């Protein structure tokens, strides 16, 4: 399959202008590409067809055929959709789309409101799930490795991108406190720590799995990595962390998966000369938490 370039899209646009006799407009155009060209490029870049995914990857809701301004967000929430429309985008690219295999297909409740907003706002919805987790340049896990100054060694199952999680080696060891501080700052989030925590403990060997990635530890009776960075953790994760001596950094599902999609948006904007609106929400950071120590009865 031929990979699209900005020059190829430019050639297509000039041909269209000549056919439609729109030469005066060529001097003042805003660049565009077809949505089919965008999804074809993303399918190949992210190797989307190599994954067994619950998500329907690619175009999920059709809007304008021409793409001039993209918005990127972690999830196709109503807030993200409204933000993209207000920014004047014609295409919203997300990690978590609206349509999943085996899920209730009825367009009712808030899902109806999301689709209604997309259609009325004339906004394409494009989603890539596991391909965005596993990509070694633009993926969620690769981004987590990058912000810590780490190099991706391989996938958790060597050579198997469908295992999603990655083994990471830091260029220089960092303390637990330093890693937590970097994650808080770069992801704009709160970080919870599980395991026998010593703030000055040095770490250089990590596993990373964005989103609900605690299964990397939950299912590994003898983990060989010092620490795991993930979005969510469950009850079993706590016990495995304590019993195996593995430290777990829990950064929040949304926070672990929203920056890489914006990085992908920057790449698309630069490559195809599109406008780009990155959407960022500090959901986990803004959620209030309580720990009330009192003898008072409630």
Where are each of the predicted segments found?
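Active-site catalytic microenvironments in core metabolic enzymes, especially phosphate/sugar-handling
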Residues: 33-298
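Polybasic, lysine-rich low-complexity intrinsically disordered segments
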Residues: 14, 20-21
């Amino acid at each position: 399959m031929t990979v699209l370039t900005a020059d190829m899209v430019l050639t297509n646009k000039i041909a269209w202008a000549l056919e439609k006799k729109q030469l005066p407009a060529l001097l003042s155009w805003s660049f565009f590409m077809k949505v089919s060209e965008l999804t074809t490029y993303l399918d190949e870049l992210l190797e989307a067809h190599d994954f067994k995914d619950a998500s329907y990857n690619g175009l999920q809701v059709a809007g304008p055929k021409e793409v001039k301004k993209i918005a990127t967000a972690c999830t196709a929430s109503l807030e993200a959709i409204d933000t993209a429309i207000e920014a004047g985008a014609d295409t919203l690219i997300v990690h978590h789309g609206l349509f999943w295999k085996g899920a209730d297909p009825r367009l009712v409740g808030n899902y109806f409101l999301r689709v209604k907003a997309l259609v009325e706002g004339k906004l394409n919805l494009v989603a890539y799930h596991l391909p965005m987790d596993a990509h070694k340049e633009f993926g969620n896990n690769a981004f987590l490795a990058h912000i810590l100054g780490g190099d991706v060694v391989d996938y958790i199952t060597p050579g198997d991108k469908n295992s999603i999680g990655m083994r990471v080696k830091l260029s220089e060891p960092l303390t637990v406190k330093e890693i937590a501080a970097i994650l808080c700052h770069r992801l704009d989030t709160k970080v919870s720590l599980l395991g026998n925590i010593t703030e000055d403990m040095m770490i250089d060997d990590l596993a990373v799995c964005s989103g609900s990635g605690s299964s990397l530890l939950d299912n590994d009776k003898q983990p060989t990595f010092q620490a795991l960075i993930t979005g969510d953790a469950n009850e079993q994760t706590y016990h495995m962390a304590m019993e195996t001596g593995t430290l777990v950094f829990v950064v929040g599902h949304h926070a672990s998966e929203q920056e890489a999609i914006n990085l992908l948006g920057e790449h698309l904007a630069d490559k195809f000369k599109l406008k780009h609106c990155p959407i960022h929400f500090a959901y986990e950071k803004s959620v209030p938490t309580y720990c009330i120590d009192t003898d008072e009865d409630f």
